[in-house]
Amino acid sequence: MDPQGQLRNLRDFLLVYNRMTEICFHRCSSNFNYRNLTMDEERCVDSCAGKLIRTNHRLMGTYVQLMPAMVQKRMQEMESKAAEMAKAEAEAAAKAGTSVPDNPSSAITNASMMSPSIQDIPNTSSTAPNGFQILSSPDNTSDIKTSSMTNGSAFGETNLHVITNDAKTFTNQSLDELITPSPVNTSVPETPTAGGAGQTPS
């Protein structure tokens, strides 16, 4: 039963209880102010009080029997409300977390527009000294090897020509030194004497 229906039932019960009490006591006496009750009035009041006490006992017994079921029902209602709130929060978080555009192609297009273009990168290919050319595409290793071998052969021919000229010069100089006779030393060495060093014998 909904809370509004429970309140209506409780209100109706209290109205009936109050009306029954008024009828019972008014039947005993119309005025209870500042006077003592007679014997008949006392017996009537005692009868009405007994009826109210028995009614209250039955009401409390019924409440004790229904109280566990009422508490269980309230707990289930609270748990269901908490589960609904948690589910609503989870759905809201999922919607907030999955706020990604539905079209993946548009996302890829935006990402490509944000990333720097490959054409904007400057060309780093240049010509190094001594004829060694750095190619812009290092993947073609055959071209690099061919260029290196060609430049190396030209460099080797130049060095070989210089070495050949140096060898010829060295050969001519060595022949001139061999042909030119070296001076022969014909002087007699001096013999030291007792008279003093550096005197020749007579």
UniProtKB/Swiss-Prot annotation:
The protein's role, per its UniProt record: Component of the TIM22 complex, a complex that mediates the import and insertion of multi-pass transmembrane proteins into the mitochondrial inner membrane. The TIM22 complex forms a twin-pore translocase that uses the membrane potential as the external driving force.
Biological processes, Gene Ontology terms: protein transport
Membrane topology note: Peripheral membrane protein
Keyword Ribonucleoprotein listed: no
Compartmental location: Mitochondrion inner membrane
Alphabetized UniProt keyword annotations: Disulfide bond, Membrane, Metal-binding, Mitochondrion, Mitochondrion inner membrane, Protein transport, Translocation, Transport, Zinc
Gene label: timm10b
Pfam families: zf-Tim10_DDP
Disulfide pattern: C24-C48, C28-C44
InterPro entries, A to Z: Mito_inner_translocase_sub (IPR050673), Tim10-like (IPR004217), Tim10-like_dom_sf (IPR035427)
One Gene Ontology MF term: metal ion binding
Coiled-coil annotated spans: none
Name of the featured protein: Mitochondrial import inner membrane translocase subunit Tim10 B
Organism: Danio rerio
Metal-binding among keywords: yes
PANTHER family recorded: MITOCHONDRIAL IMPORT INNER MEMBRANE TRANSLOCASE SUBUNIT TIM9B
Comment text on domains: The twin CX3C motif contains 4 conserved Cys residues that form 2 disulfide bonds in the mitochondrial intermembrane space. However, during the transit of timm10b from cytoplasm into mitochondrion, the Cys residues probably coordinate zinc, thereby preventing folding and allowing its transfer across mitochondrial outer membrane.
Cellular component terms (Gene Ontology): mitochondrial intermembrane space protein transporter complex; TIM22 mitochondrial import inner membrane insertion complex
Motif Twin CX3C motif per record, residues: 24-48
Chain intervals for the UniProt region annotation (Disordered): 178-202
Family: Belongs to the small Tim family.
Subunit organization: Component of the TIM22 complex.
